[in-house]
């Protein structure tokens, strides 16, 4: 029987048991993150994928990170974790990957060494309830509704899990991203990088790829100066996925070339 999934350059992702299939959001986020300096670190470090689903983001990180990096994926859905575990086992980096069925709250409470150099998430973003009785549809709704994981809960756990010099990456719809940024700031997470994504030229913004880091008070001695000092403004860029003729743009190809089979 033919496998249901998506073939990347160095690995295959099966996703038939997952509520959320392989999609552009995660591919963009994983590609964007793996261009960062943390990926090439030579020291032992740990990464975490919150809401791992099929394990795609965790495996994308494994492809580009050093042998000293271990990546864990967590998800509340049993079927998704089963799928992620199989995808990880079939990847070339199985020895550096693991998947656990857990909510981020329980994972944080039970984690023996809760400091990750990099945390990544493609989190839920719908607020309003959607009623459905079909099992797979229910799971898809849960994966995309904040009733299962509110943004406030996500951020509160990220600040407990993230190493002092670590970076948190996520992708959100453009119309909810500013509220998310404003939630992160009082928790000590400052936006350091933002990529605004457009589907085609002359369209409204579609997605925001965001990177956060803890405010760094190390160079400021007194509390008053620290409170009055603003962090460096974030680096901002834009990306357009398609040309007007609905072909992948050169910019999008350049971003995802290490993963897409035909780029």
Curated annotation (Swiss-Prot):
EC number from the UniProt entry: 2.1.1.223
Function: Specifically methylates the adenine in position 37 of tRNA(1)(Val) (anticodon cmo5UAC).
Keywords: Cytoplasm, Methyltransferase, S-adenosyl-L-methionine, Transferase, tRNA processing
InterPro entries according to UniProt: DNA_methylase_N6_adenine_CS, SAM-dependent_MTases_sf, Small_mtfrase_dom, tRNA_Adenine-N(6)_MTase, tRNA_adenine-N6_MeTrfase
SUPFAM superfamilies reported for this sequence: S-adenosyl-L-methionine-dependent methyltransferases
Catalysed reaction equations from the record: adenosine(37) in tRNA1(Val) + S-adenosyl-L-methionine = N(6)-methyladenosine(37) in tRNA1(Val) + S-adenosyl-L-homocysteine + H(+)
Subcellular compartments: Cytoplasm
Protein name: tRNA1(Val) (adenine(37)-N6)-methyltransferase
UniProt lineage: Bacteria, Pseudomonadati, Pseudomonadota, Gammaproteobacteria, Alteromonadales
Predominant location: cytoplasm
Top-rank lineage group of the source organism: Bacteria
């Amino acid at each position: 029987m033919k496998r249901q999934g998506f073939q990347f350059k160095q690995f295959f992702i099966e996703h038939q048991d997952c509520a959320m299939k392989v999609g552009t959001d995660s591919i963009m986020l994983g590609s964007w993150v793996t261009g960062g300096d943390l990926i090439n670190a030579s020291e032992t470090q740990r990464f975490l994928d919150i809401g791992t689903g099929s394990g795609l983001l965790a495996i994308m990180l494994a492809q580009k990170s050093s042998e000293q990096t271990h990546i864990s994926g967590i998800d509340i859905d049993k079927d998704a974790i089963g799928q992620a575990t199989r995808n990880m086992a079939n990847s070339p980096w199985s020895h550096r990957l693991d998947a656990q069925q857990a909510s981020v709250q329980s994972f944080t409470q039970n984690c023996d060494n809760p400091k990750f150099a990099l945390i990544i998430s493609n989190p839920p973003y719908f607020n309003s309830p959607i009623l459905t009785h079909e099992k797979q549809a229910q799971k898809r709704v849960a994966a995309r509704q904040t009733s299962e994981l509110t943004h406030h809960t996500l951020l509160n756990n990220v600040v407990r899990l993230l190493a002092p010099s670590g970076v948190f990456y996520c992708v959100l719809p453009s119309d909810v991203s500013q509220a998310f940024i404003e939630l992160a700031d009082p928790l000590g997470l400052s936006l350091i990088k933002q990529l605004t994504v457009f589907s085609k030229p002359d369209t409204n913004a579609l997605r925001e790829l965001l990177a956060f880091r803890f405010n760094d008070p190390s160079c400021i001695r007194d509390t008053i100066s620290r409170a009055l000092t603003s962090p460096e403004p974030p680096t901002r860029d834009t990306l357009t996925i398609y040309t007007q003729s609905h072909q992948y743009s050169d910019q999008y190809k350049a971003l995802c070339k290490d993963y897409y089979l035909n780029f």
